[in-house]
Every structure is written in structure tokens, then in C-alpha cells.
């Protein structure tokens, strides 16, 4: 992972989602509790 993606404690930075992205994530979660990494990335780029 890129150095700017981690916080001071070495953990990955929290992703901030827009309202639209949050709604999409909630819809996906309703049907499938375990989103694939690929699907999370697709929603993040929406």
C-alpha cells in the first residue's frame, strides 16, 4: 500500500464516502453482507 494511504499507526486511512456511495453500499449490503474488494472499489469510483 502507498505510504500516504496509512495513518501514523500504520493502519489504512478511513475511506470517506459520498451520500450516493453510502446508499449504494447499503443496497449492496442488503443483498450480500460481504462485498468483494473489486465491488467496493467500483462503488468508490462511482
UniProtKB/Swiss-Prot annotation:
Keywords: Developmental protein, DNA-binding, Homeobox, Nucleus, Transcription, Transcription regulation
GO molecular function list: DNA-binding transcription factor activity, RNA polymerase II-specific; RNA polymerase II cis-regulatory region sequence-specific DNA binding
Pfam families: Homeodomain
UniProt key word Methyltransferase: no
Any Gene Ontology biological process: anterior/posterior pattern specification
Subcellular localization: Nucleus
One cellular component term from this protein's GO annotations in UniProt: nucleus
Residue range(s) of DNA binding per entry: 10-46
Homology family: Belongs to the Antp homeobox family.
Record PANTHER family: HOMEOBOX PROTEIN HOX (PTHR45659), HOMEOBOX PROTEIN HOX-B5 (PTHR45659:SF2)
Function (record text): Sequence-specific transcription factor which is part of a developmental regulatory system that provides cells with specific positional identities on the anterior-posterior axis.
Protein name (database record): Homeobox protein Hox-B5
Organism: Ovis aries
Amino acid at each position: 500500500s502507498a505510504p500516504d494511504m496509512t495513518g501514523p499507526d500504520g493502519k489504512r486511512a478511513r475511506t470517506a464516502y459520498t451520500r450516493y456511495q453510502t446508499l449504494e453500499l447499503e443496497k449492496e449490503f442488503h443483498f450480500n453482507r460481504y462485498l468483494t474488494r473489486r465491488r467496493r472499489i467500483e462503488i468508490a469510483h462511482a
